[in-house]
Curated annotation (Swiss-Prot):
Belongs to the UPF0597 family. GO terms for biological process: L-cysteine catabolic process to pyruvate. GO terms for molecular function: L-cysteine desulfhydrase activity. It comes from Shewanella pealeana (strain ATCC 700345 / ANG-SQ1). This is UPF0597 protein Spea_0809. InterPro entries: Ser_deHydtase-like_asu, UPF0597.
Amino acid sequence: MKQHLWPLFLEAIKRDVVPALGCTEPISVALAAAIAIGELGIKNQASNVKMDVSVSANLMKNGMGVGIPGTGMVGLPIAAAIGAVAGDSNAGLEVLKNLTDSDVQAAKLMLDNGQVTVGVADVANVLYAKVTVYYQQQTASVTIADSHTKVIAIEKNGEQCLPAPEVESVNDKSNKANPFTEARLQDIYDFAMHAPLDDIGFIMQSKSLNDALSIEGLSGHYGLKIGATLVKNQEKGLLSGGLLTEVLARTAGASDARMDGAMMPAMSNSGSGNQGIAATMPVVACAEFLKSSETQTIRALMLSHLTAIYIKSYQNKLSALCGATTAAMGSAAGITYLLDGEIEQVSAAICSMIGDVSGVICDGAKTACAMKVSSSAGAAVKSALMAIDGIRVTGTEGIVADDVDQTISNLATLANGAMTQTDVQILEIMMHK
């Protein structure tokens, strides 16, 4: 076992599995706005500023149609406005945790008065947001790039102001050693199975946060009400009970609430709340259905989240490939373990997942993401059950190879290569429909 990687795995988990209030792409805009207001020291006058927001094409795609927590609205303009009015610049991905009804009204008035403009920047960065604030004779601009809380530039009245705020060092450790350049899935599995429970027990926080979101979503007041619809039709007798229905409903419920702007944080994975949900809730629902022990649940969640990060490490931060599908591959691993599978079966489940849901597009963050999240959760259950029975998509089929790590690499080649043009086409359709 490569135990020298274990401290790095822990760092990766603590960096990439963190609470996030609201979809992380518009939240990065809100954070930049909050920091810019702080630079000018005009918190009490924030509703009187004008703002220019410039974002990468990918961030525009993921910010156009998603609910902003506590506002009842969607999109980047309200994210920028509410970030300026109510944002906590030291709270990272929970920048909007303290907003009030009066803050929301002030932010909406800013939009009504045309104080916020949003456009697409011609930049190489896949994840990029620059917010420039104008107040009387003063200006401040904040640029976030490459990671949702990574502040790369702050400018006040034409002068560079560095170093960046502490939020960067707290939430982004991208300069740290990357354990995944050396790691293989076997190493992820060994860590999840054998690391001391005292070192990894914190992963149960993902269960607490995302299960609370699920319960809220199942109330039937959010988004497309996918989770609530599944529960209702189970009660009608149109759907049977059992593991699959439980996983689908619990997972969809969390995503319903998340994508419709519930004022509750999700435990994210790789910078995405939906990916955190997809890596958490199928495992949680399965563990409860099987009456698994707390120890088993901890190890299954750690296997799921770290596998999701490992798979994502091969890919660009944002792409045309739906991140919920790759995160749910982590859940396939965790569920397989809960069903008494070992590394051979875990590998088989991931290969089958890639044979099933590879190529599902990301056409922006929105309430309909809950459909893709629940579909991916269903694929995770299906692949795990197949693996336990010794069945998998084989290395002669499509992009799936005999070796699981090669299969993961093949998926990344698809996402980082040919699907870049897919991304361009998706945004073009979205902007002109």
